[in-house]
Amino acid sequence: MNKIVIASNNAGKLAEISRLLAPLGIEVVTQSSLGVTEADEPHMTFVENALAKARHASLATGLPALADDSGICVSALRGDPGVFSARYAGEPRSDERNNRKLVEALHGQSDRRAYYYCVIVLLRHGQDPQPVIIEDTWRGEIIAEPIGQGGFGYDPHFFLPELGKTAAELSIEEKNRISHRGKALARLVQMLSENETVPVVPV
């Protein structure tokens, strides 16, 4: 069975990624289970951070590595929180504090448009010169009051007008079909299943 190390310790992300890669028979292991600490994310773009995380995990384990960097970008805030989404309210990181800061930042704003952005990077080995890079988005609006118990991050405040509900009200299956990460991973799964890239095998 093929094996990939996931360059994240975020439980929500790990659950989504494991579920979507399962049909390919790929064994997903977390970097923390292999004693690998999280990489720094010093860059100002999502793709640079994802590349840094994937390379760190692959070099440390000798396995192919999959990393994503994602966040929420709000039109009225000129794209913020962006790459700082996970630490928008500072340390210690907290979804509740991040959401509170976002709602406060949008107080009095009529433009509530926002989108989740995700970039996924697959490295076949630590020195892979041609990483697979896939991007996708998920558009919605920010609402002041949280609704729903599911998801993570900004999901309770991310309203989907076409569905009349927030991301936190979706089942895991629904979310995987339409979310930024779900769509990007689905494209990666299709690419791997069609052998459009080098097979994912341990090196």
From Swiss-Prot:
Substrate binds at S8, N9, N10, A11, G12, K13, S70, F152, G153, Y154, D155, K175, H180, R181. Keywords: Hydrolase, Magnesium, Metal-binding, Nucleotide metabolism, Nucleotide-binding. Belongs to the HAM1 NTPase family. Gene3D superfamilies: 3.90.950.10. Its EC number is 3.6.1.66. It comes from Nitrosomonas europaea (strain ATCC 19718 / CIP 103999 / KCTC 2705 / NBRC 14298). This is dITP/XTP pyrophosphatase. Mg(2+) binds at D40, D69. NCBIfam families: RdgB/HAM1 family non-canonical purine NTP pyrophosphatase (TIGR00042). The active site is at D69. Pfam families: Ham1p_like (PF01725). Pyrophosphatase that catalyzes the hydrolysis of nucleoside triphosphates to their monophosphate derivatives, with a high preference for the non-canonical purine nucleotides XTP (xanthosine triphosphate), dITP (deoxyinosine triphosphate) and ITP. Seems to function as a house-cleaning enzyme that removes non-canonical purine nucleotides from the nucleotide pool, thus preventing their incorporation into DNA/RNA and avoiding chromosomal lesions. Binds 1 Mg(2+) ion per subunit. It is an enzyme of class 3 (hydrolase). GO terms for biological process: nucleotide metabolic process; purine nucleoside triphosphate catabolic process. GO terms for cellular component: cytosol. GO terms for molecular function: dITP diphosphatase activity; ITP diphosphatase activity; metal ion binding; nucleotide binding; ribonucleoside triphosphate phosphatase activity; XTP diphosphatase activity.
